[in-house]
Regions:
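Short, glycine/proline-biased beta-turn/loop segments that scaffold the active-site neighborhood
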Residues: 15-29, 142
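Generic hydrophobic/packing signal
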Residues: 3-8, 23, 41-48
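Short, surface-exposed loop or secondary-structure junction motifs
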Residues: 30-200
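Active-site SXXK
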Residues: 1-16, 114-122, 197
Length: 200
């Protein structure tokens, strides 16, 4: 949200412009009222919450390997495929199920909306990726040295939290941050510490 507001302050985007102006893959064709940047910022785009499109699955479909191709948080092909999949899914959802209300009418938390916002930042922020923009324009200026969007780094950081989930009725710990990582970073890839969050 802060990064979007930085772009708005610089006159690069308009909060009341339709998302399709910045992300043409999102056609908005099944809605009478256009979803705007402001709607997504306030989780009022009218979308129902959806399961995550996982970064690992998208990277695998593209034949990418993190050891060879680098952290997927900085990979343009993953971001391009991710935004295409998210945009198609939201367009399909509104055609099949309608909306959870007209854009701006109701709050409905949807990670896909913030995923699209992060892609606006990737496209218009002047940096190679959303993660690069966040580091240069938000995290470094605030001195947030233990905050990032990387997927590989936390699995190698002994201070990173262990993720737990129930598998076959048993709680199991994992340090695989791809397991539930949304393909577009703005939809939930940020990792931080309480100390860093105080700086924000």
């Amino acid at each position: 949200a802060l990064s979007i507001m930085q772009l708005e302050e610089k006159g690069m985007i308009d909060l009341d412009a339709p998302i399709s102006q910045y992300i043409p893959e999102f056609t908005n064709k099944n809605q009478s009222k256009k979803v705007t940047v402001r709607h997504l910022l306030s989780h009022a785009g009218g979308f129902f919450p959806l399961p995550r499109i996982l970064v690992g699955n998208v990277a695998e479909s593209l034949g990418l390997d993190e050891e060879k191709d680098g952290d997927f948080a900085y990979n343009d092909a993953v971001a391009q495929e991710g935004v295409k999949l998210v945009a198609e899914r939201l367009d399909a959802q509104t055609k099949e199920n309608g909306l959870n209300g007209q854009p701006g009418e109701y709050l409905s938390y949807c990670n896909d909306g913030f995923g699209l916002l992060s892609d606006i930042i990737r496209r218009y922020g002047g940096e190679p990726s959303y993660a690069d923009y966040l580091v240069k324009h938000v995290l470094k200026p605030l001195g947030m040295e233990r905050s990032f969007c990387d997927f590989v780094r936390p699995s190698k950081d002994e201070n990173a939290a262990t993720l737990y989930k129930k598998v076959d009725g048993v709680m199991r710990g994992s340090r695989d941050y791809h397991d539930n990582a949304f393909v577009l970073n703005g939809g939930g890839a940020m990792k931080s510490t309480l100390h860093d969050l105080k700086k924000y």
